[in-house]
């Protein structure tokens, strides 16, 4: 599991940062990529990476401001040009209006896609769940309807303890598969063994939270609780003047992000959606200020890739 930042700026593109889009790379977990927001020129950014549009199976849109959605029609069209077909459908989760926006752009430009799109209007709570992941949405406080997302990976089953099976003189073969599935098996010699006795501890799944435009609110902490990574907007810095600007424009400061990361017991905080004025020394100052409140903080740049490892068992690390 990895995060790849395709755009880390706010409002409009700059020389150093494109507008918002983040890829959650789930190639090992489900051979797929999920996009969170698709700002203008996201498809151009993708061309500079190893990402393949056909691998994108889900798109999550936080809100309908242009710097978060203007790249959608172009990306969808290019995905079609690159050969996506009816066996590679795409689901777009977003506020009411995202379907109208996409369909209007495609209709007026007479663009016909070679694959189906399913649209899911966001509601509070679980918006997607299967055997590998669950995604939870909650409303934010911005100038228009806006949402945050919590991606929860399901726990991974423990490994089959082969050495323990051998010590118990349990012969290899199909029985191992049954025990791995947690079944109770009767062996040829009459012994009855329970698969759960030969399976190691489950590996706890990872949690990633996306808060891309909002002023502070209780739902941010709720979505971020115990997250391995919290990706949080930081349109403004921590000065008193910038705090006033953030409040006026319904955004957050870097201090807001650090505070919620600390209260929510987040492992790593990644700041994105930065104003264009944050370049060079100002970025270093921003990092320095935030790390005084939350040490494990990183300021994302376009094309950064961040690994999200499994948490080590506390007993293992002793």
UniProtKB/Swiss-Prot annotation:
- Superkingdom of the source? Bacteria
What molecular function terms (GO) are annotated for this protein?
3'-tRNA processing endoribonuclease activity; zinc ion binding
List ligand-binding residues for Zn(2+) 1.
63, 65, 142, 213
UniProt entry keywords in alphabetical sequence? Endonuclease, Hydrolase, Metal-binding, Nuclease, tRNA processing, Zinc
Task: Give the cofactors, semicolon-separated.
Answer: Zn(2+)
Bilayer-crossing residues are none
Where is Zn(2+) 2 annotated to bind? Answer: 67-68, 213, 273
**Pfam families according to UniProt:** Lactamase_B (PF00753)
The EC number(s) given in the record are: 3.1.26.11
SMART domains listed in its UniProt record: Lactamase_B (SM00849)
Q: Which reaction does it catalyse?
A: Endonucleolytic cleavage of RNA, removing extra 3' nucleotides from tRNA precursor, generating 3' termini of tRNAs. A 3'-hydroxy group is left at the tRNA terminus and a 5'-phosphoryl group is left at the trailer molecule
The cofactor remark states:
Binds 2 Zn(2+) ions.
By its UniProt entry, which InterPro entries does this protein fall under? Metallo-B-lactamas, RibonucZ/Hydroxyglut_hydro, RNase_Z/BN
Q: Which HAMAP family match?
A: RNase_Z_BN
* Family per record: Belongs to the RNase Z family.
Q: What does this protein do?
A: Zinc phosphodiesterase, which displays some tRNA 3'-processing endonuclease activity. Probably involved in tRNA maturation, by removing a 3'-trailer from precursor tRNA.
Q: How does it assemble?
A: Homodimer.
Protein name, as recorded: Ribonuclease Z
Originating species: Leuconostoc mesenteroides subsp. mesenteroides (strain ATCC 8293 / DSM 20343 / BCRC 11652 / CCM 1803 / JCM 6124 / NCDO 523 / NBRC 100496 / NCIMB 8023 / NCTC 12954 / NRRL B-1118 / 37Y)
């Amino acid at each position: 599991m990895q995060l790849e930042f395709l755009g880390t700026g706010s409002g409009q593109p700059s020389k150093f940062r494109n507008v918002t889009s983040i890829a959650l790379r789930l190639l090992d977990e489900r051979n797929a990529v999920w996009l969170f927001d698709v700002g203008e020129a996201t498809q151009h950014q993708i061309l500079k990476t190893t990402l393949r549009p056909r691998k994108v199976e889900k798109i999550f849109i936080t809100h309908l401001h242009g710097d978060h959605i203007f790249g959608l029609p172009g990306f969808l069209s290019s995905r079609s040009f690159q050969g996506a077909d009816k066996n590679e459908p795409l689901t777009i989760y977003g506020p009411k209006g995202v379907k109208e926006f996409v369909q209007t752009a495609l209709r007026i430009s007479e663009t016909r896609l070679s694959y189906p799109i399913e649209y899911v209007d966001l509601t509070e709570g679980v918006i997607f769940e299967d055997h590998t992941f669950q995604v939870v949405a909650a409303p934010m406080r911005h100038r228009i309807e806006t949402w945050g997302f919590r991606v929860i990976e399901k726990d991974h089953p423990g490994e089959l303890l082969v050495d323990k099976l051998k010590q118990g003189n349990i012969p290899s073969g199909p029985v191992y598969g049954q025990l791995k599935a947690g079944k109770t098996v009767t062996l040829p010699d009459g012994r009855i063994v329970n698969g759960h006795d030969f399976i190691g501890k489950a590996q706890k799944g990872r949690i990633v939270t996306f808060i891309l435009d909002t002023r502070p609110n209780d739902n941010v902490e709720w979505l971020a609780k115990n997250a391995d990574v919290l990706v949080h907007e930081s349109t403004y810095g921590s000065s008193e003047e910038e705090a006033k600007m953030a409040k006026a424009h319904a955004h957050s400061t870097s201090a807001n992000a650090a505070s919620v990361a600390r209260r929510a017991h987040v492992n790593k905080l990644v700041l994105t959606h930065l104003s264009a004025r944050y370049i060079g020394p100002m970025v270093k100052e921003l990092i320095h200020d935030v790390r005084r409140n939350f040490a494990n903080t990183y300021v994302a740049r376009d094309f950064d890739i961040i690994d999200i490892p499994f948490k080590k068992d506390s007993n293992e690390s002793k």
